[in-house]
UniProtKB/Swiss-Prot annotation:
Residues 279-301 have a biased composition (Basic and acidic residues). This is Structure-specific endonuclease subunit SLX1 homolog. Pfam families: GIY-YIG, SLX1_C. Residues 237-306, 311-330 are annotated as: Disordered. It is an enzyme of class 3 (hydrolase). Keywords: DNA damage, DNA recombination, DNA repair, Endonuclease, Hydrolase, Metal-binding, Nuclease, Nucleus, Zinc, Zinc-finger. It comes from Monosiga brevicollis (Choanoflagellate).
Length: 420
């Protein structure tokens, strides 16, 4: 399912589904006829739980190959969502599937898992693993929500969860548990909402594109335009885009030396200089990419500037139990530059200086807009009140608290977003 970006509908998370002989009215699933397959479970990642369940039951094509080969009907049991990005969500999925291979989980779950491989694949063992994961860093520091879709599995989970809670000193501070079903609007991703979101992303990207052009023109940086000569510089109007302000209404911070507005000729692409390889040596690796994209200031996802509507309905966003290791997540690292470098107009939460194109950290809470310089956040974490004690010799922070939403987490969890 989906989790991190709840407000945008385009969410991400995990599901635990299993083959059942029960029929639930909201899913219209027929009882399975193969009794040998009862209790079979599957763990995966998806951005659309409803579509993913239909793929498991062979109602639509695409994905879920291992679970559609005459393996009966499937029901969705639980969904975990609220991850800061897809990389964190996919790491959660891999650790849930391979707890004894995960460096974070192997010691925590070794005493709860049975010795045989077949018993480790049963639903009870997977629930024990999930309970241990929710007490393990970094997932214990993330604002996750565990939604149970089936009452009988929720009752079994309650007994397992109470056993784990008795062995711990405190509950996970940010965990939320609730019950629901797939008819919840949170889990619905219809075509109309997806199309509206895509149009808005394209309009915001065009606005941001024009904003950067105007700012660079006032700063008299002709080299900036050299790398943009291959892009369509025309931004859509309000009537064409249907969302977002017109680029002409974007305010540009004044620059020193000249207060005149940029002339139309200043926005024209400058002639390029090529070396013996046919490449402009003044361009960095991002500017040399013909598919270079600009990111929206209000969106964590990048959208192409010269595309009005991007059809992402064909992107399933699902996996079927890949065998990547705990650190081998290169195919899934889709974190954009916004997670590492600040955008125009963003300021540090401590020194209140601009973080535009500077290395910064972001809040792990997906709904918080906190940004801070790495050094400023580290100093605030070491000395929360801004005053150093003569006996304070610690140089590396242990925990950090967001000054906006009060979200607390280990320093390693904060710095992981910068070092991905």
């Amino acid at each position: 399912m989906a989790g991190g970006y709840i407000a945008r509908v385009n969410m991400k998370g995990h599901y635990l589904s299993w083959s059942s002989d029960n029929t639930y009215p909201w899913q219209n699933i027929q009882p399975t006829q193969n009794t040998k397959l009862l209790g079979l479970q599957d763990i995966g990642f998806t951005t659309d739980p409803v579509r993913r369940l239909r793929q498991h039951n062979s109602e639509i094509g695409g994905g879920a190959v291992r679970t559609t080969r005459a393996k009966g009907s499937w029901d969705m049991a639980a969904i975990v969502y609220g991850f800061p990005n897809k990389v964190a969500a996919l790491r959660f999925e891999w650790a849930w599937q391979h707890p004894l291979k995960s460096r974070r989980l192997r010691d925590a779950v070794r005493s709860d898992l049975p010795a045989s491989r077949a018993a480790q694949m049963q639903l009870t063992a997977k629930l024990h693993t999930l309970a241990a994961m929710l007490y393990t860093v970094p997932w214990s520091d993330q604002p996750l929500t565990l939604c149970w879709l089936q009452p009988d599995i929720a009752d079994k989970w309650s007994n397992i969860w109470q056993r784990h809670c008795q062995c711990q000193s405190a509950l996970p501070p940010f965990l939320t548990t609730r019950s629901g079903n797939l008819q919840d609007p949170l889990f619905q991703l219809n075509n109309a909402a997806a199309a509206a979101s895509t149009i808005q992303r394209a309009a915001l990207a065009a606005d941001h594109h024009a904003w950067r052009l105007a700012a660079a023109a006032q700063a008299q940086a002709p080299d900036f335009f050299t790398g943009l000569g291959r892009l369509d510089l025309a931004a859509p109007s309000v009537e064409e885009s249907g969302a977002g302000p017109h680029p002409s209404s974007c305010s540009v911070p004044p620059s020193t030396g000249s207060s005149a507005a940029p002339t139309p000729g200043a926005l024209a692409p400058q002639p390029t200089k090529q070396n013996k390889f046919g490449v402009d040596p003044r361009l960095d690796s991002d500017d040399r990419d013909d598919n270079h994209q600009f990111e929206s200031p209000d969106n964590h996802e990048a959208a192409a500037v010269n595309v009005d509507v991007v059809d992402d309905s064909a992107d399933d966003g699902t996996t079927d139990g890949n065998e990547d290791g705990p650190d081998d997540v290169a195919p899934h690292q889709e974190v954009t530059a916004r997670h590492v470098h600040g955008a125009i107009g963003e300021t540090c939460g401590h020194c209140h200086q601009s973080v535009y194109q500077e290395l910064c950290i972001v809040c792990l809470n997906a709904t918080c807009t906190y940004r801070a310089h790495l050094l400023c956040a580290a100093q605030a974490a070491v000395h929360p009140l801004g005053q150093s004690s003569p006996s304070e010799t610690r140089l590396v922070p242990l925990r950090h608290s967001c000054p906006r939403c009060a979200h607390q987490a280990h320093w390693a969890s904060w710095i992981a977003e910068v070092t991905l």
